[in-house]
From Swiss-Prot:
EC number: 1.14.11.-
Name recorded for this polypeptide: Gibberellin 20 oxidase 3
One Gene Ontology MF term: gibberellin 20-oxidase activity
Reactions this protein catalyses: gibberellin A12 + 2 2-oxoglutarate + 3 O2 + H(+) = gibberellin A9 + 2 succinate + 3 CO2 + 2 H2O; gibberellin A53 + 2 2-oxoglutarate + 3 O2 + H(+) = gibberellin A20 + 2 succinate + 3 CO2 + 2 H2O
Native organism: Oryza sativa subsp. japonica
Gene: GA20OX3
Cofactor binding remark: Binds 1 Fe(2+) ion per subunit.
Lineage of origin: Eukaryota, Viridiplantae, Streptophyta, Embryophyta, Tracheophyta
Entry-linked InterPro entries: DIOX_N, IPNS-like_FE2OG_OXY, IPNS-like_sf, Iron_ascorbate_oxido_reductase, Oxoglu/Fe-dep_dioxygenase_dom
Pfam annotation, one family: 2OG-FeII_Oxy
Family label: Belongs to the iron/ascorbate-dependent oxidoreductase family.
Length: 367
């Protein structure tokens, strides 16, 4: 099949989308997916939690069942959020050739990507993304700001400054959220925070252009995030959908997450699920597109340091909960998803099988 260039300015106006973007009928959204049932996920008042250290049982149950909840009273300045969206709009309004100055290279997880057209030739997502690394490690205080100038030019300095501030704020917020999750697991409140304090987060700006045939394609296909934690702010268009459990899957029951301007959606990824020895869930989700308007979202992925070994705290391993995953580093899992495997519904299972084959063992008894 001939290669296709994802130029949002052109494709969003086409009546028929290219075949590479058409998903199989059993994976594509139904024509009436704009009215799917909403999922009820708990809301954590973060300011109240930080003051008291207590959470509701509904939060712990959500982490065990599907790994989704929302946080409010999080301390993120609404003016910073508004400017982050304004810069997102400004970036995606630029000509394709200009955005491609920051083109994502094969095997890398940062840069501009237009629908993965360079990596795959079918079931392409109807989106373009801009991803960049950020770090709280000493010497990296200007990492994001410098990246925008180095990759795109001096005229992007303000944009880089905005996202530097945004990443700094989101790093602090994500570390606070790890305390919520530690309490949900019955651990000491700060027990997981140190694991991520010197980590390698990634920030992503998502743009889903309008599509004349939204029932044939997806903005992001069904997948579990390979990362540890995802903190998502979605605009008022909506499009995030979750498959919360096996019962919903059997009924084909995707559930919509209603946008909430004052909240961040938190979802647990595969790496965090492994860190909890499977006590917390990483569940399937996807993004649908809109037939009339563009959708944008700001996504922050919390990750440990690349060389940090992901291994559960001893308190989470016992006779009733034997080791569910082998030890691995975040670098190993990241490289697996960038070089060997397209993240989907079975990424972690495929990764575990790959580790076992590479290391020459069949069980986890050694752990």
């Amino acid at each position: 099949m001939a290669a296709v260039v994802f130029d949002a300015a052109i494709l969003s106006k086409q009546e028929a989308i290219p075949a590479q973007f058409v998903w199989p009928a059993d994976e594509a959204p139904a024509a009436d997916d704009g009215v799917v049932e909403e999922i009820a996920i708990p809301v954590v008042d973060l300011a109240a939690f930080l003051a008291s250290g207590g959470i509701g049982r509904d939060v712990a149950e959500a982490c065990e069942r599907h790994g989704f909840f929302q946080v409010v009273n999080h301390g993120v300045d609404p003016a910073l959020l508004a400017e982050a969206y304004r810069c997102c709009d400004a970036f995606y309004a630029r000509p394709l050739a200009e955005k491609q100055r920051a083109r994502r290279r094969p095997g890398e997880n940062h840069g501009y990507a237009s629908s993965f057209t360079g990596r795959f030739d079918c079931k392409l997502p109807w989106k373009e993304t801009m991803s960049f690394n950020c770090s709280a490690a000493p010497g990296n205080a200007r990492m994001v700001a410098d990246y925008f100038v180095d990759a795109l030019g001096e005229e992007y300095r303000h944009m880089g400054e905005v996202y530097q501030e945004y990443c700094d704020v989101m790093t602090r917020l994500a570390l606070d959220v790890t305390e919520v999750l530690a309490v949900a697991l019955g651990l000491g409140r700060g027990e997981l925070r140190g694991f991520f304090a010197d980590g390698d987060p990634v920030m992503r700006l998502n743009h889903y252009p309008p599509c004349r045939q939204p029932h044939l394609t997806l903005g992001t296909g069904p997948h579990r995030d390979p990362t540890s934690l995802t903190l998502l702010h979605q605009d008022d268009v909506g499009g995030l959908q979750v498959l919360p459990d096996d019962a919903a899957a059997a009924a084909g029951g995707w559930r919509a997450v209603r946008p909430r301007a004052d909240a961040f959606v938190v979802n647990i990824g595969d790496t965090f699920a492994a860190l909890t020895n499977g006590r917390h869930a990483s569940c399937l989700h996807r993004a649908v597109v809109n037939g009339r308007v563009a959708r944008r979202s700001l996504t922050f992925f919390l990750n440990p340091r690349l060389d940090r070994v992901v291994s559960p705290p001893p308190a989470l391993v016992d006779a009733a909960h034997p080791r569910a995953f082998p030890d691995f580093t975040w670098r190993e899992f990241l490289e697996f998803t960038q070089r060997h495997y397209r993240s989907d519904t079975n990424t972690m299972d495929a990764f575990v099988a790959w580790i076992k084959q590479r290391n020459g063992y069949e069980s986890l008894d050694k752990y």
